[in-house]
Amino acid sequence: MRQSLLSATGQSLNLRDNGFNVIVGQRQGKTYEKAVEDGWVPGETLFGIEEACDKATIIMCLLSDAAVMSVWPTMKPYLTAGKALYFSHGFAITWNDRTGVVPPADIDVIMVAPKGSGTSLRSMFLEGRGLNSSFAIYQDATGKAMD
């Protein structure tokens, strides 16, 4: 993952602070302004969702269940062959008949699900602690999903 360009829609500070090559995709508004306050630079590390998804090799969907469903139509066209889609929880993908979140067959789909909120995860990270997580591979199109 360290060699990949990660696009995060949602929580991303821990990735940046751990040295990952990460950009943020946000819609204009409060969350975009918050990202700027957190040090993300428009046009360098902060983009609209479409541009961030287009640039990335791993597209991280780190949003609430409701937000995943609303942003899915925006993200889906950028899930091209060989990319990976990363979730932080499994509702949208597990209940895809209800959410409409059906990834293309030629991408990897993985999940790393912390056992707590993004806020808790960030607080614990800043304290030098971690949080238990579950890991799953939903789809391994490239044979590299475990990497």
Predicted regions and their residues:
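NAD(P)+-binding Rossmann beta1-loop-alpha1 motif at the extreme N-terminus of oxidoreductases
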Residues: 1-43
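Glycine-rich, highly charged phosphate/nucleotide-binding loops
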Residues: 39-50, 116-117
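Gly/Ser/Thr-rich loops at beta-strand to alpha-helix junctions
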Residues: 4-9, 29, 66, 85, ...
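Short, surface-exposed connector motifs at secondary-structure boundaries
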Residues: 13-19, 54-57, 131
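Rossmann-fold NAD(P) dinucleotide-binding segment
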Residues: 48-101
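Short, glycine/charged-enriched secondary-structure capping and boundary segments
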Residues: 14-17, 38-39, 74-77, 99-103, ...
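Structural motif
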Residues: 21-23, 57-60, 83-84, 107-110, ...
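Rossmann-fold dinucleotide-binding core
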Residues: 86-147
